[in-house]
Amino acid sequence: MSASTTATTRHDWSLAEVKALFQLPFNDLLFQAQTVHRAHFDPNRVQVSTLLSIKTGACPEDCKYCPQSGHYNTGLEKQKLMEVQKVLEEAARAKAIGSTRFCMGAAWKHPSAKDMPYVLEMVKGVKAMGLETCMTLGKLDQDQTQALAQAGLDYYNHNLDTSPEFYGSIITTRTYSERLQTLAYVRDAGMKICSGGILGMGESLDDRAGLLIQLANLPEHPESVPINMLVKVAGTPLAEEEDVDPFDFIRMLAVARLLMPKSHVRLSAGREQMNEQMQALAFMAGANSIFYGEKLLTTANPQADKDMQLFARLGIKPEAREEHADEVHQAAIEQALVEQRSSELFYNAASA
């Protein structure tokens, strides 16, 4: 099974085709992914974004991976919606350290009418700084989507998380079709889409393939496809799940690159548990977007200077804003604070 390196994109992938890609010899898969990547991107440029949690904890959703859910006791401090001025100060700091995207994430099922005016002011203020804006606020209705677009929001993150078949085992408070509807509203409003999923929740290979099929078979591919590795947090139902095999994670990135050749594939939550060698393999597999800074919502993220040191060693440079208009920021799945252990490839956050 091989993937085309032409500019043609497909929206009719089958499960058998995608599983065949996953089952390729590792070197062959990476070669194909890197070849496709080079046909559409500079292989030595990686887009960087900063993420800020503007409202933390007490979410009414029951996502089993998430410490921000009000259904679980994870010890995460609940916080109200951040003041607009504070958000703008954080955005200015993000711009100063080199970010070109600023994403604001709120732990909501959906934004309320009373919060929307503040959210819209955040978008306008960040946009005025010359940063590209993105948000993840949960489910949106059509009016909210239009309001965000009119305020200048560039990108909206709404993950599918996993396959339709496995989804009900992870979340019961929001349906898969509701997620797809929000994505449709976002696209109709003229904004760009960031949507991906999580590995390590107990899903099968069919589920991993099924997630990518859902994304690749959308009428338009998401501009950004975040691939998250579960960060296991004590108190959540998935705290004792087995670690993801690092080669399986790299395979997921590579297949995402083959199915969605023009999308930015984001190395997302879980990067804290990856050593430099694994991150280098991720870039070889076609990942070309990361978070930059100290925190990823409620999960620790490698320090910014450490990221830049790795970039220098690999000959990678941050992607400048003007070099592309089709990147989206991903508000990676909310997880709890995890200490950095750079000497280990993975470690169980539940033991911290």
Swiss-Prot record:
State any GO BP term from the record.
biotin biosynthetic process
Keyword set includes Iron? yes
Record GO terms (molecular function): 2 iron, 2 sulfur cluster binding; 4 iron, 4 sulfur cluster binding; biotin synthase activity; iron ion binding
Matching PANTHER family: BIOTIN SYNTHASE, BIOTIN SYNTHASE, MITOCHONDRIAL
**Role:** Catalyzes the conversion of dethiobiotin (DTB) to biotin by the insertion of a sulfur atom into dethiobiotin via a radical-based mechanism.
- Source organism per entry reads Pseudomonas putida (strain W619)
Where does the chain bind [4Fe-4S] cluster? Answer: C59, C63, C66
Keywords per UniProt? 2Fe-2S, 4Fe-4S, Biotin biosynthesis, Iron, Iron-sulfur, Metal-binding, S-adenosyl-L-methionine, Transferase
Name of this chain's protein:
Biotin synthase
- Give the family this protein belongs to, as stated in its UniProt record: Belongs to the radical SAM superfamily. Biotin synthase family.
Enzyme class per UniProt? transferase
The protein's matches in InterPro entries, at most eight in alphabetical order, are given as: Aldolase_TIM, BATS_dom, Biotin_synth/BioAB, Biotin_synthase, Elp3/MiaA/NifB-like_rSAM, rSAM
Q: What Pfam families does this protein's entry cite? A: BATS (PF06968), Radical_SAM (PF04055)
Q: Which cofactor does it need?
A: [4Fe-4S] cluster; [2Fe-2S] cluster
Query: Which CDD domains does the annotation name?
Result: Radical_SAM (cd01335)
